Amino acid sequence: MSRPDFNTAGSTVWACEEIVQYLKPVLEGQENELDKVAAVERHIGRFDKAEDIKRWMARRGGGVRVAALRVTEYDTIGGRLIGNVNFVAYVFTTDQWGYTKDTRAEVITGRLVRSIIDRNALPTAYSQVANVRSDNLYNGQIDELGIAIWSVTWSQQWYLDEEIDLGSLDDFITFGLRGEIENDAPTIDGEVHLPQ
């Protein structure tokens, strides 16, 4: 059986991928580039447990994950589907080369904000960014992991009927499952290797 076609029109996947590709040259760098991170990628799946963050940050001094949170309004203009999308970019950093994680996170957050509010930013979007905001997501549990996290949120109109090259997406090879039956009970963990 061959892999079936998957029509992504009407989704925010293309917009997120465009934002990631725009931010990569601005924010990705080597370990000694303290105002940059190791990876900029589209945020997918749950990411609300300390173990998830710790696993993703392993062997990284920092990273940025971009996600669409919601589409607040849809419209058709010239036969195209346009959506007003609320985005978030999470900035993760660790202490590096004697510089604190908190300082690095603030600096990288500032670079991210400056790059998306530039007049020529995100040329494939339908509109300029609006309602840009950044927040320090400090809490004791995250601090114990040795990580600082900031978020940058904004709204922007994007075409939602763009097709994406499915070959550009990560392969869906494994499916991980963690089931919680009740509080303080052992979890059910599993990993399934999917046929390709």
Predicted regions and their residues:
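Small/polar-rich, solvent-exposed N-terminal microdomains that initiate assembly or binding
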Residues: 1-77, 171, 177-196
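Short, solvent-exposed beta-strand/turn "edge" segments of beta-rich domains on protein surfaces
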Residues: 58, 74-82, 141-147
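Oligomerization/assembly interface segments of phage tail-like spikes and tubes
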Residues: 81-96, 146-159
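Short, cysteine-centered beta-strand-loop-beta hairpins and adjacent loop/turn segments enriched
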Residues: 74-76, 94-99, 158-165
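Extended, charge-rich C-terminal regions with high alpha-helical propensity
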Residues: 140-196
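A short, terminal or domain-edge coil/loop segment
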Residues: 84-106, 178-196
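Extracellular/virion structural assembly segments
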Residues: 10-11, 16, 80-84, 92-118
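Acidic-leaning, charged glycine-interspersed low-complexity segments
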Residues: 26, 60-61, 102-165
